[in-house]
Amino acid sequence: IVASLASYGFARYSGKLRSLVFFSYVILMLMPYQVTLVPNYLVAEKLNILNTYWAIWLPGIFSPFAVYLLTKFMKRIPVGVMEAAQIDGAGEWQIYRLICMPLCKGALCSAAILVFIDYWNMVEQPLILLSDAEMHPLSVFLSKINSGEIGLAFAVATIYMVPSLLAVSYTHLR
């Protein structure tokens, strides 16, 4: 939802500042996570969310990839539809909520799935931001399994795929 709000602003308005901020989103999207690891750690420390699930969830909520994907989708919504809504008396919030969001449902589902899978597969972030091993996701446990424990590795890998498959199945039904 946060990404859709930012995307609406990027898609609907133009200007030098908008272009600069959107370009910074694209640069952040292209950077590997390891480059932003120290700043993310410092922000999590400042917000006092180290060793909590929020340290993992917040970067996903503000994902630059989701903003980029949704912005590109929202730019394809005909301007005439939004202008017609304005003529009918709709404000910005109503245009966003009643026109853009229903039209972007497929893009929202795609962005949610891709961001979820991206953060579900992370290993470095939980290792750095979560000191309690019980809070680590399966991706960390899967990376620690030795090659001699092949049966355990396949069992964990099968369990590891279930949340992603459920997320795809759930959004496919929508």
Regions found by a protein language model. Give the residues of each.
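A structural signal for multi-pass alpha-helical bundles of membrane permease subunits
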Residues: I1-R174
